[in-house]
């Protein structure tokens, strides 16, 4: 079985379309676990409508916990996911019919090679669309998900995987643990664990339509444009990003170091110790260790604010 975890908040406008796309998957052995974080629109009403229609497929979590963020909402919802495999779903996308089946097929191939006890994460590709599900032309090289540098040292400072594309096995789901403020995003946290202790694999296939609208948390942006690059360097978040990466890395070490492969334990320890050095030493060790982002402009900002 596959548990599909959906974290909702004021998503009524697109929710029915997304739920229908999941229920119409070719892979049928699923359960949709939905946790709402205090919506004031018709989101909960829609969920209850679908739960009544598909009682064996839809679970609505009612725990009276106010999370206040997408990452916390997802991780709170994941506590109820007990199936052998777990996926995450946004409330406003559209899954193509074979998304689950093709993800499961690849997962089983990997588990047959390395075993089910290792954390495994597989993820596909999305097609950006507008709010009416009409295609948006975004050159592949300009997408935020373009590079897929699935190297542990790179992943410590930049995530390349959207949660809505992921399938994780039970070993990975169990290793994620409870929410902590040091976790930057639930998908990034999952990728770090899988990369350090097991494996992460990209499936080069469009599996879903990623709806672009004003309320998206993350989008398919042109990371090569001058405007985007300049904004990233000047953005106040960039100044604070390095310490956030270190805090997340420290949490990974505290919680999961015994799971990590020996070489990744060493890489993680070296990364954490960077902050004990002066700026020039940190810059040198970032470069030597390969703890770098995906392109020149991002790296400049990273080194400038380290």
Model-flagged regions — what are they?
Residues 183, 189, 211-306:
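C-terminal subregions of glycosyltransferases and related glycan-biosynthesis enzymes
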């Amino acid at each position: 079985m596959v548990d599909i975890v959906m974290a909702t908040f004021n998503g009524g406008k697109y929710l029915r379309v997304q739920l229908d796309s999941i229920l119409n998957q070719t892979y049928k052995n699923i359960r949709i676990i939905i946790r709402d974080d205090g919506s004031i629109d018709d989101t909960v009403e829609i969920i209850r409508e679908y739960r009544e229609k598909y009682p064996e497929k839809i679970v609505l979590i009612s725990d009276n916990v106010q999370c206040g963020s997408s990452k916390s909402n997802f991780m709170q919802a994941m506590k109820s996911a007990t199936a052998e495999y777990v996926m995450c779903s946004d409330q406003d996308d559209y899954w193509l019919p074979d998304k689950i089946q093709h993800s499961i097929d690849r997962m089983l191939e990997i588990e047959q090679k390395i075993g089910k006890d290792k954390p495994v994460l597989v993820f596909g590709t999305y097609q950006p669309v507008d709010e009416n599900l009409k295609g948006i032309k975004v050159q592949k090289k300009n997408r935020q998900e373009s590079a897929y540098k699935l190297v542990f040292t790179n992943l410590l400072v930049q995530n390349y995987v959207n949660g809505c594309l992921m399938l994780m096995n039970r070993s990975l789901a169990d290793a994620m643990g409870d929410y902590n403020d040091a976790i930057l995003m639930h998908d990034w946290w999952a990728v770090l664990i899988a990369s350090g202790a097991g494996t992460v694999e990209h499936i080069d296939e469009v599996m879903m339509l990623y709806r672009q609208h004003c309320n998206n948390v993350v989008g398919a942006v042109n990371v090569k444009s001058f405007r985007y690059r300049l904004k990233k360097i000047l953005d106040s978040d960039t100044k604070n990003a390095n310490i956030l990466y270190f805090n997340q890395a420290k949490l990974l070490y505290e919680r999961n170091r015994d799971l990590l492969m020996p070489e990744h334990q060493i890489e993680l320890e070296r990364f954490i110790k960077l902050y004990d050095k002066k700026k020039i030493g940190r810059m040198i060790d970032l470069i030597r260790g390969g703890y770098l982002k995906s392109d020149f402009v991002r790296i400049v900002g990273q080194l400038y604010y380290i």
